[in-house]
From Swiss-Prot:
Converts GTP to 7,8-dihydroneopterin triphosphate. Keywords: Hydrolase. It catalyses: GTP + H2O = 7,8-dihydroneopterin 3'-triphosphate + formate + H(+). Gene3D superfamilies: Urate Oxidase (3.10.270.10). GO terms for molecular function: GTP cyclohydrolase I activity. Belongs to the GTP cyclohydrolase IV family. This is GTP cyclohydrolase FolE2. Pathway: Cofactor biosynthesis; 7,8-dihydroneopterin triphosphate biosynthesis; 7,8-dihydroneopterin triphosphate from GTP: step 1/1. The lineage of its organism: Bacteria, Pseudomonadati, Pseudomonadota, Gammaproteobacteria, Pseudomonadales. Its EC number is 3.5.4.16. The record marks 149 as: May be catalytically important.
Length: 298
């Protein structure tokens, strides 16, 4: 008995002729290797459907090509290779291939002073595309940090000065008395407000960038801000964090400018955008600032 040939409906033509910008799948579960660890990722994979007569693409071919990302460290040549397989398997249908990966790798981060360390999550999105032999990759990275309001800090200092003048009116306190007063609840009568804040970085990676610069960009951004949220801490680390906040007072405008300056000096960026959000503890709304830069632009 002869085996039946299974029908391939995707090869049929359509009566409604129209090329499509993107056809594919989203939310595909996929393990990838990042920074020496296996990370659960979600992939959106697709190609353009440029043949207006074709009814559809071969989605299973895209799905199977993603297996090329499972073994070995995730890097840009590997991503480009997968996109090329997308196009090779749709040579008569498609000219453009797309792949987006959403993942949240963990990086071990040291405490500020003590020998402790802990894991921190870094939400990451990789957008890649291939068209006419040109490969482009954009990396989206979210950083979390603390921001202390400069205005609130000035107001708190003023209240401390007023309390000092009130408590020592007509007196000439000695050094020990002032030191004891500063260490009491009577001395520090007000503190500035601060909040957990986030920075969304989108970096268009240069053509000669091969590796995935997750840790490099995380270090660059956190160093520029100076107040990255911590993992495991002792009291000495908490005190160092309080000092860092006091020495890095920031409006959202200050934070975005710090990050912008740092990324301008990053050689693997062909362009970038920065968006910071300060989830105000004083207000019921957020403070937001954005900037953008493109290499070679005026």
């Amino acid at each position: 008995m002869n085996a039946l040939t299974l029908p391939d409906i995707a090869r049929q033509t359509t009566l409604s002729t129209l090329p499509l910008d993107w056809v594919g799948m989203q939310g595909i579960a996929l393990p990838v290797q990042v920074a020496g660890q296996t990370v659960a990722a979600e992939a959106d994979a697709g190609v353009s459907l440029d043949d207006p007569q074709a009814r559809g693409i071969h989605m299973s071919r895209l799905y199977l090509a993603l297996a090329g990302l499972e073994d070995g460290e995730l890097d840009l040549p590997r991503l480009r290779g997968v996109l090329q397989r997308f196009l090779d398997s749709h040579a008569d249908l498609s000219r453009r291939a797309y792949l987006r990966l959403r993942l949240a790798p963990l990086l071990r981060r040291p405490a500020l002073v003590s020998p402790l360390s802990g894991w921190k999550r870094y939400p990451l999105v990789l957008d890649t595309r291939l068209e006419n032999g040109t490969f482009q990759a954009d990396l989206h990275l979210e950083l979390t940090y603390s921001s202390t309001c400069p205005c609130s800090a000035a107001l708190a200092r003023q209240l401390i000065q007023e309390r000092f003048a009130q408590d020592f009116a007509g007196q000439q306190p000695d050094h020990a008395t002032i030191l004891a007063w500063l260490g009491s609840s009577d001395g520090i009568v007000a503190t500035p407000h601060s909040q957990r804040s986030s920075a969304q970085l989108r970096i268009g990676l240069a053509e000669d960038c091969a590796g995935l610069p997750l840790e490099e960009l995380a270090d660059l951004g956190e160093c520029a801000l100076g107040t990255a949220v911590q993992t495991a801490v002792k009291r000495a680390d908490e005190q160092a964090f309080a000092l860092a906040n006091g020495q890095n007072l920031m409006f959202c405008e200050d934070a975005v400018r710090r990050l912008h300056r740092a990324l301008r000096g990053y050689p693997q960026a062909r362009e970038f955008s920065v968006r910071v959000v300060h989830a105000e503890s004083l207000h019921a709304h957020d403070a937001v600032a954005e900037s953008h830069w493109q290499r070679g632009a005026a």
